[in-house]
């Protein structure tokens, strides 16, 4: 279903009738999101590619310690600073998703529903997996938290985090 990875939020089928494995694939696509430069939410395909290549290089480095490895994206070498930036973004992204899942699980919902709600709101996807009731099953507080998650996800985390830095509010 292209609506999941493109984050258009429009679906014509009832996903709850699909096999569970298919729902998990859609959940994975919710986290990856759209392409770089698009207005789609999510972690972005390019960042997922960089993470996969970093993991591959680290595995090869442990197997062949004397081998010199570089990471190439579209024919050009990706410097270490950019790689570290993507890894830091992944850490913040995972921390926020885990925090959302933890808070939303206080509503005593199924883990698939809670994880789907966290991914759907933070990545601005739209559909909710595991239930046909949509977001009506969540408490008002959870809906408020998911609203903030939508804003944080749309802004790609960092601009929102800047609001909490004391340097942002100093008059220097």
What are the residue ranges of the model-derived segments?
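Membrane-proximal intracellular helices of multi-pass ion channels
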Residues: 1-172
């Amino acid at each position: 279903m292209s609506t999941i990875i493109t984050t258009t939020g429009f679906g014509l089928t009832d996903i709850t009738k699909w096999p569970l494995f298919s729902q998990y694939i859609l959940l994975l696509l919710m986290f990856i999101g759209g392409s770089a430069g698009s207005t789609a939410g999510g972690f972005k395909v390019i960042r997922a590619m960089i993470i996969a290549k970093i993991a591959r290089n680290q595995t090869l480095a442990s197997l062949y310690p004397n081998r010199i490895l570089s990471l190439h994206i579209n024919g050009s070498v990706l410097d270490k600073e950019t790689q570290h930036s993507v890894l830091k973004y992944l850490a913040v992204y995972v921390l926020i998703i885990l925090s959302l899942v933890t808070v939303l699980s206080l509503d005593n919902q199924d883990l698939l529903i809670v994880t789907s709600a966290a991914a759907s709101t933070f990545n601005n996807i739209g559909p909710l997996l595991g239930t046909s009731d949509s977001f009506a099953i969540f408490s008002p507080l959870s809906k408020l938290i998911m609203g903030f998650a939508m804003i944080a996800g749309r802004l790609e985390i960092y601009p929102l985090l800047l609001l909490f830095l004391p340097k942002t509010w100093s008059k220097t």
